[in-house]
Amino acid sequence: MITERQTDSNAMWGGRFSEGPTAIMREINASIPFDKRLWQQDIAGSKAHLKMLVSRNIITAEDGQKILEGLDKIAAEYAEKGVPEDWSLEDIHMVTEKRLADLIGSAAGRLHTARSRNDQVATDFKLWVRDAIDMVDKGLTALQTALVIRAEEHAATVMPGFTHLQIAQPITLGHHLMAYYEMISRDRSRFSDGRKRLNQSPLGAAALAGTGFNIDRHQTAKALGFDAPTANSLDSVSDRDFALDYLMSATQTAIHLSRLAEEIIIWASQPYGFVSLPDAYSTGSSIMPQKRNPDAAELVRGHSGRIAGCMNALVMTMKGLPLAYSKDMQDDKPPVFEAHDLLSLAIAAMTGMIETLTFIPEKMRKTAEAGFSTATDLADWLVRQAGIPFREAHHITGSAVRLAETKGIALDALSIEDLKAIDPRIDESVKAVLSVDASVASRNSYGGTAPDQVRARILDAKKTLGLN
């Protein structure tokens, strides 16, 4: 039964207990089902700690060698067979320590000298998040590369730009894709900033107050690739800012991926028809044989909500905790692990979609031409050529749009006679600005949609990414 009381207590901490925990206590207390993912970081941290203990003559070189060989054997076992889930041992630290004792005997107990699970798990978790950031950055770099390559192909491809999902002004597809390149650049910057902040080692902070042993925290920090040890032992074991930083950066990235996914979904719908989805990232319907559903994009959009939920989960866990370690903090890892898995998959899916989408320039151009998207160009022409205030030009242009709409024609299809009837200051030269190509080419300010500007930004991006 789940409420059956166990008579054995945990050998690692049970000396002051007269009886063991109930089965339900073992279940709620065990983190090994998820923190086994930390095994590589846990062994790396233990090796760094061990070498420091030996160098400071806190344990003998003979015991140190036994422990090191035991840790190597355990790492090989985990790599081959996975980490055993012994709930009675609670977590990855105790599972590894028990296995080490089985292999080398009592010398295993010396490894935990001058160390607590509090600083141990903080160290492991920081190392894991640091590795996760590096993996995400690699994925985001691949996505940026795909965006840049496709943007270069379509630097001059005209499409409608939208506000409120209403046709606004003509832009280029390359310009649109490069907007997402910029978003992902900020995402990478946020992850990079978080990596810099986390890169201080909590190892040696012990339970919360430091240790009376003559340890060298700078040595272990350097061995593990940290910039320095943390400066306050209490903060060291209390801190999960690095996990929250990761989740907040992941959430912002997921928002950007979701927006791109939403646009792909819209563009692939029949009323738009701007893109054709690749079979590899689409699914069909069980009842409607004609369907090609944008499921990969929809799942990226869906995953973004779950990632935001992971962030909120850890925020709620941490918001009311007193300093040092509380068992609530055992729940810090599942949301980070889940968010990382979801984000990594979303990035890979989006990269694959961008690489293989078929864009349909003819439909994009036709839609841009049909939506009065050059109305602003007419207003700008009136300001420049007729010298009238923009608000008056705006009103005149609105009248021209209304007339074209009544006639069922595009704005540039209005005759000069039609335009002069609206305002006699309009002359033949206005025709030069009313085509979508002229409109796009005129937006040549820095960062604008003119093909020359788009190509310049692509060149900058290729240099940043190290592309030839």
Swiss-Prot record:
A single Gene Ontology CC term: cytosol
CDD domains: Argininosuccinate_lyase
Pathway assigned in UniProt: Amino-acid biosynthesis; L-arginine biosynthesis; L-arginine from L-ornithine and carbamoyl phosphate: step 3/3
Sorted UniProt keywords: Amino-acid biosynthesis, Arginine biosynthesis, Cytoplasm, Lyase
Disulfide-bonded cysteines: none
GO biological process, alphabetically ordered: arginine biosynthetic process via ornithine; L-arginine biosynthetic process
Catalytic activity field: 2-(N(omega)-L-arginino)succinate = fumarate + L-arginine
UniProt xrefs under PROSITE patterns: FUMARATE_LYASES (PS00163)
Major location (coarse): cytoplasm
EC number annotated for this UniProt entry: 4.3.2.1
Family statement: Belongs to the lyase 1 family. Argininosuccinate lyase subfamily.
Protein name, entry field: Argininosuccinate lyase
Organism in which the protein naturally occurs: Zymomonas mobilis subsp. mobilis (strain ATCC 31821 / ZM4 / CP4)
Highest classification ranks of the organism: Bacteria, Pseudomonadati, Pseudomonadota, Alphaproteobacteria, Sphingomonadales
